[in-house]
Regions:
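Short, surface-exposed acidic/glycine-rich loop or hinge patches that mediate macromolecular interfaces
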Residues: 45, 123-126, 196
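A secondary-structure boundary/capping signal
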Residues: 22, 42-43, 87, 121, ...
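Glycine/Thr-rich phosphate-binding loops of Rossmann-like dinucleotide-binding domains
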Residues: 50, 94, 153, 227, ...
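Nucleotide phosphate-binding site architecture
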Residues: 27, 48, 151
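Auxiliary Fe-S-binding modules of radical SAM enzymes
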Residues: 1-39, 70-74, 104-115, 137-138, ...
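Canonical Radical SAM [4Fe-4S] cluster-binding loop centered on the CxxxCxxC motif
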Residues: 31-68
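Core AdoMet radical
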Residues: 55-71, 78-130, 135-171, 188-189, ...
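Conserved functional loop/turn residues at catalytic and ligand-binding sites
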Residues: 46, 50, 55, 80, ...
Length: 278
């Protein structure tokens, strides 16, 4: 691991910050951190949901730390990150408070590190329209909300989520931001394969996302975090990942990242470049 990796880890500990890179056991942590791309996870390290694929623990979260956005921005500035990805656990106990934390961290990063692009990966806020509107109005460079899986598997894989609600989130974010003088925000989503879905179901999800004008799609392999999590149904071949990428590109996505180790934030800066943001 390089110097940037160790500096980021040390700073996160000093500032009492979490990274999804560590909490979700991401396989790309060394590569991303050494290339000055990191994903900070706000609003605690306990999630109010228990998704079947996710390594982040479920529990009763602490009250929202209103100083956290400033500390995240400080870390971004100190590390000289060119592309910062900010996500959070689900906070079904306080959706508007969670949305406000995203608004605040976007503003703080722009104040403390004005050269950094901001990508936010948000929950669905249980479909609360005002929460979504708050984040859209803050104008992150990229607004990401992960669809995660096919509709049939939501009950076992994405407990607490609803497929149609996630589609609506992405569609409304694009529609609402289009009225701004700067034009629509770049929207992004990700899906995990290998949880029991069929190929035709994946292509159906891609069509639903393309119909809602999503710009960036990431496709990665599910890797079971523990025996307590959803079993992996199978490992997709390189040819299958290439096929999925080709099919998605044909549907009109501006950028598709597809491969076994692809995660939401993998090559995030390069994805921004491909859409003309950098």
């Amino acid at each position: 691991m390089g110097e940037t990796f160790h500096n980021l880890k040390k700073l996160a500990r000093e500032l009492n910050l979490h990274t999804v890179c560590e909490s979700a056991h991401c396989p790309n942590i060394g590569e991303c951190w050494n290339h000055k791309t990191a994903t900070f996870m706000m609003l605690g390290n306990l999630c109010t949901r228990r998704c079947g694929f996710c390594a982040v623990p479920k529990g009763k979260p602490e009250p929202i730390d209103h100083e956290e956005p400033s500390r995240v921005a400080y870390a971004v500035a100190q590390l000289g990150l060119k592309h910062a990805v900010i996500t959070s656990v689900n906070r079904d106990d306080n959706n508007l408070g969670a949305a406000q934390a995203f608004v605040n961290v976007i503003a703080e990063i722009r104040r403390q590190s004005p050269g950094t692009q901001v990508e936010v990966l948000t929950p669905d806020f249980q479909g609360v329209p005002e929460a979504r509107r708050m984040v859209v109005a803050a104008r992150p460079e990229i607004l990401n909300h992960n669809i995660e899986t096919v509709p049939r598997l939501y009950r076992v894989a994405k407990s607490g989520g609803r497929y149609e609600r996630s589609l609506e989130f992405l569609a409304e974010a694009k529609r609402e931001s289009s009225a701004h003088e700067l034009g629509p925000i770049v929207t992004k989503t990700g899906i995990i394969v290998g949880m029991g879905e069929e190929m035709h179901e994946l292509l159906g999800v891609f069509r639903d996302l393309a119909d809602r004008k999503v710009d960036i799609l990431t496709i990665g392999q599910y890797l079971r975090p523990s025996r307590d999590h959803l079993p992996m149904s199978r490992f997709y071949t390189p040819d299958e990942f290439a096929f999925l990428k080709h099919e998605a590109q044909q549907m009109g996505f501006r950028h598709v990242e597809s491969g076994p180790l692809v995660r939401s934030s993998y090559h995030a800066h390069e994805q921004a470049q491909s859409t003309g943001l950098a």
